């Protein structure tokens, strides 16, 4: 599926403001599209920042830089690479897994089993834009087949005509 970053960020922020959740957790696999970035210097935030930039951009657009920085500082908004989710239990959280087409089956299972009480997960991705090695099955494609028809789980598929982009694209 494809989605609109600002609309999804808005849904997460609204859930937080209604006290439906206590925090927003943004997760993304660190998979490069084509070219290799190699070793990145810096701390964890600096290393994963390039992969999570689209999520930051959507939040900044909605809330402004200062408010987002304050919410991150207070751990109300957390931005985490998928690789560091193992062993966690995410309670009362609005959790967004972006670019899920680039998860393996094992990573998707690990992510979905992190959901705790009072949490909701939104998994987004585009199965036409998989950047995994050819022999690996996309976790998104796999989970769409497995969870079809399961109560409490829904999927929305957008077609190319639903995606609004500049005509030049």
Where are these regions (language model features)?
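Conserved helicase motor core of SF1/SF2 NTP-dependent helicases
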Residues: 1-97, 101-168
